Amino acid sequence: MDSNTVSSFQDILVRMSKMQLESSSGDLNGMITQFESLKLYRDLLGEAVMRMGDLHLLQSRNGKWREQLSQKFEEIRWLIEEVRHKLKTTESSFEQITFMQALQLLLEVEQEIRTFSFQLI
């Protein structure tokens, strides 16, 4: 796992949490939760790739892992759309920078998950 990606996730989550304090947006809270969930999933998938023997354990423990993978891509697409919408509607430069970084991170994570999943398939 790339340490820059980890710090990027942490930075964006902290920034979004600060925005949450300023506005009582339930949508933003949901986005933060989705980001945290996505980070955990990406980390677990990356660890499984590092230990290729875990592929069989992963498949036997959860026969629906491809379905889960598909669901995660749906979540990523949803988050990308939400972030794009927030970018269009916000006027705060702090929020714009945060959402631009979040969008870039989502695209990077989507690519990482695709790479991991192809290695597992």
Curated annotation (Swiss-Prot):
Query: What protein is this chain from?
Result: Nuclear export protein
Q: Which Pfam families match?
A: Flu_NS2
Q: What does this protein do?
A: Mediates the nuclear export of encapsidated genomic RNAs (ribonucleoproteins, RNPs). Acts as an adapter between viral RNPs complexes and the nuclear export machinery of the cell. Possesses no intrinsic RNA-binding activity, but includes a C-terminal M1-binding domain. This domain is believed to allow recognition of RNPs bound to the protein M1.
**Assembly and partners?**
Interacts with protein M1. May interact with host nucleoporin RAB/HRB and exportin XPO1/CRM1.
Q: GO BP, one example? A: exit of virus from host cell nucleus through nuclear pore
Query: Does the keyword Transport feature in the UniProt annotation?
Result: yes
Has keyword Hydrolase? no
Which gene carries the instructions for this protein? Answer: NS
Query: What InterPro entries has UniProt attached to this entry?
Result: Flu_NS2
Cellular-component GO terms for this entry:
host cell nucleus; virion component
Name the HAMAP family for this protein. Answer: INFV_NEP
Origin species: Influenza A virus (strain A/Gull/Maryland/704/1977 H13N6)
